Amino acid sequence: DRVEAWIGEAVAGGARLAIGGGRLSSTILEPTVLLDPPAEARISREEVFGPVLALYRYQNLDDAIARANALPTAFQASVFARDIGVALRAADRLDASAVMVNDPTTFRTDWMPFAGRRTSGYGTGGIGYTLRDMTQEKMVVLRRG
């Protein structure tokens, strides 16, 4: 109900519904794509945790990076570009824990750091980081003889 309400709020505020927006069943929402939701809509300011993709139109790369860096959340970002130099410069400027180039933010390997920034969370997950953070090392020295 929460995600459905956020979709409705965005559409009422001027977002265009490209696809979805309804329910597949009483418990499953359709994958939804919103075009240009208003900046003040909750779907633009908070992590959705639902099958929703919000797409925004920008004037230029500086505008896109400023908008992304102004968000309260900063888990992962994606940059799609034909020019790898442009993509890498954008990745360097984005304040996100991970930046995928020409790949969606669903990419993850077990050994990569898995972290949030700002309101997306603190600390780092992933197998190596979790083992380090969830265990205590102890050294035992045994003198023989």
List PLM regions with ranges:
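Short secondary-structure junctions
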Residues: 12-23
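Conserved C-terminal structural/oligomerization subdomain of aldehyde/semialdehyde dehydrogenase
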Residues: 12, 28-145
